[in-house]
Design a protein with these regions (language model features):
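Core of compact, soluble alpha-helical bundle domains
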Residues: 1-139
Length: 139
């Protein structure tokens, strides 16, 4: 049995964020949103999202931003589809399951699901997603 660390430190959360978004950049359904549509600067995005998840999960201050407003602006250009929300959550959960385990890992997975469901309802141009998370293969 191999030991997987929990997502209990900013360093581990940063590693999760980088690992996840490398996968996003290679995903046929998500890459067009992040790479083509949003033109994400990955190093800035990794830093911002590391601060976001450290704030959400560990209570560490430092995140400043308005994610719903930014995502809503993107969705006005090309509306987000429900399968994109499902893929984002499935890939996020799969990334966590492949490298981390423990109460913080499970908590972040639950919070990611809630955030994605909320975004799908709060962004006017997005398709509302039913919250069903597809099975992904752990790699």
């Amino acid at each position: 049995m191999s030991y997987l660390p929990d997502l209990s430190t900013p360093e581990e959360i940063g590693r999760l964020v980088r690992t996840f978004y490398v996968r996003v950049a290679e995903d046929d359904l998500l890459a067009p949103v992040f790479v083509d549509q949003a033109g994400v600067d990955w190093s800035t995005h990794w830093e911002t999202l590391t601060k976001f998840w450290c704030n959400v999960e560990l209570g560490i201050p430092g995140f400043v931003g308005a994610p719903t407003r930014k995502h809503a602006a993107l969705s006005e250009e090309v509306p987000f589809r429900s399968e994109q929300f499902a893929r984002w959550v499935g890939l996020f959960h799969d990334t966590i399951d492949s490298g981390w385990s423990g109460p913080h890992a499970e908590s972040i997975k639950a919070k990611a699901l809630i955030i994605a469901q909320s975004q799908s309802r709060m962004i006017p141009t997005a398709e509302t997603w039913d919250g069903e998370v597809p099975a992904m293969s752990v790699s």
